[in-house]
Amino acid sequence: MIVRTIDEIIGTENEVESDTWTSRRLLLEKDGMGFSFHETIIYAGTETHIHYQNHLEAVYCVGGDGEIETVSDGKVYPIQDGTMYALDQHDEHYPRGGKTDMRLICTFNPPLVGTETHDENGVYPLLSKQPVGK
């Protein structure tokens, strides 16, 4: 059994920060679960361009507010506590923090190894050896 707390992650290499978000990576590829599991904070009033070309992601909001815009059709979806969205088509998108920081619980398939950050196109590199959907 794997048991971890957020306090064990904060301040370690498994807490990755940018100007617009912080990702606390609780499960990674090395844990052998077939997915990675993260707590991500999107800062209030910020916008981030993301396009996970190599990963599928499911996200559940557990606090705060914001929105997500899909680039392909310009649709904007409000996000608040209790909202789930899944990027099942490698959707290019813009998560935006609202009036308060948005706290999200995220899973990635294939799992992240832990060192990934977005490149200039909003893409995480594929570092996992596991194929998408397996």
From Swiss-Prot:
It holds the Pfam family Ectoine_synth. One of its GO terms (biological process) is ectoine biosynthetic process. One of its GO terms (molecular function) is ectoine synthase activity. HAMAP family: Ectoine_synth (MF_01255). Belongs to the ectoine synthase family. Catalyzes the circularization of gamma-N-acetyl-alpha,gamma-diaminobutyric acid (ADABA) to ectoine (1,4,5,6-tetrahydro-2-methyl-4-pyrimidine carboxylic acid), which is an excellent osmoprotectant. Its EC number is 4.2.1.108. This is L-ectoine synthase. InterPro entries: Ectoine_synth (IPR010462), RmlC-like_jellyroll (IPR014710), RmlC_Cupin_sf (IPR011051). The keyword Cell inner membrane does not apply. Induction: By osmotic stress. Pathway: Amine and polyamine biosynthesis; ectoine biosynthesis; L-ectoine from L-aspartate 4-semialdehyde: step 3/3. It catalyses: (2S)-4-acetamido-2-aminobutanoate = L-ectoine + H2O. Keywords: Lyase, Stress response.
